[in-house]
């Protein structure tokens, strides 16, 4: 079993749910504000804002919070966020991409660098690992929308490139530039998605033993606990046996 979603599941099971939820809403709100500032505050005219709102709703973010984040973009509170990407190597040589929205580049860079260093990894230059990933669209549906065959058929009709169906969800991959059209076609066939976003998908994975996997998990926890960090992507994989130990 491969991918950052493994560790996401572990973190959600082990975590302080209220604290995790609060931090998630804060990050979703920041993405909505940035999207609204960069384009029109009307989601029908702003694709990035539309996706940000849809993802916020999928995570049960209250409507008031969403509206407040949009209004914040029109205010003069002086908060301007820069989009920054960091790349580096984690324990076991795992490649890591970190996306952040920050109002203080020095603070964020210092925090991210410290996280890598303490884990035994190292922060690299922009472009040092991203060439080993593909920028793609990811559309996720709960398994309740239908079986694998139904979702595969809908995905093919919509122009998607790949489908991975599991017990809990269907993950549909499409070309980066096609995410708007594909997600719209899928919504017509399957209903509203659980999430729609662009991701960094690894071209190949690095297998980790239990010790290294625990070190990577610790690094990911530290990074995702940072308020400025929006997304973290890695190229690890672990065996089912190691996965069970990490989940215990």
Swiss-Prot record:
Localization, UniProt: Cytoplasm
Any one annotated GO CC term: cytosol
Single Gene Ontology MF annotation: DNA binding
Keyword Signal annotated: no
GO biological process entries: regulation of DNA-templated transcription
Main location: cytoplasm
Disulfide bonds: none
Keywords in alphabetical order: Cytoplasm, DNA-binding, Transcription, Transcription regulation
Top-level taxon of origin: Bacteria
Family as reported in the entry's similarity comment: Belongs to the TACO1 family.
Classification via HAMAP family: Transcrip_reg_TACO1
Cited NCBIfam families: PRK00110.1, PRK12378.1, YebC/PmpR family DNA-binding transcriptional regulator
Protein name per its UniProtKB record: Probable transcriptional regulatory protein Oant_1200
Organism: Brucella anthropi (strain ATCC 49188 / DSM 6882 / CCUG 24695 / JCM 21032 / LMG 3331 / NBRC 15819 / NCTC 12168 / Alc 37)
Top-level taxonomy: Bacteria, Pseudomonadati, Pseudomonadota, Alphaproteobacteria, Hyphomicrobiales
């Amino acid at each position: 079993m491969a991918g950052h979603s493994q560790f996401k599941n572990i973190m959600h099971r082990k975590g302080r749910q209220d604290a995790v939820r609060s931090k998630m809403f804060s990050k979703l709100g920041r993405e909505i504000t940035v999207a609204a500032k960069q384009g029109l505050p009307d989601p029908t005219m702003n694709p990035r804002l539309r996706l940000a709102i849809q993802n916020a709703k999928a995570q049960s973010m209250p409507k008031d919070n969403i509206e407040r984040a949009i209004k914040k973009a029109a205010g003069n509170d002086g908060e301007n966020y820069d989009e920054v990407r960091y790349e580096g190597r984690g324990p076991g040589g795992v490649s890591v991409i970190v996306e952040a929205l920050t109002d203080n580049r020095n603070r964020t860079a210092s925090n991210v660098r410290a996280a890598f260093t303490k884990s035994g990894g190292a922060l690299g230059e922009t472009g040092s690992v991203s060439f080993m990933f593909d920028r793609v669209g990811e559309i996720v549906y709960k398994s309740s929308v239908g079986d694998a065959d139904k979702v595969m058929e809908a995905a093919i009709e919509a122009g998607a490139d790949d489908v991975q169906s599991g017990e809990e969800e269907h993950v549909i991959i499409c070309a980066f530039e096609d995410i708007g059209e594909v997600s719209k076609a899928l919504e017509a066939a399957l209903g509203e998605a659980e999430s729609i976003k662009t991701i960094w998908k690894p071209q190949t994975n690095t297998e980790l033993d239990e010790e290294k996997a625990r070190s990577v998990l610790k690094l990911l926890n530290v990074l995702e606990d940072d308020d400025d960090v929006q997304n973290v992507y890695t190229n690890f994989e672990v065996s089912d046996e190691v996965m069970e130990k990490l989940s215990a």
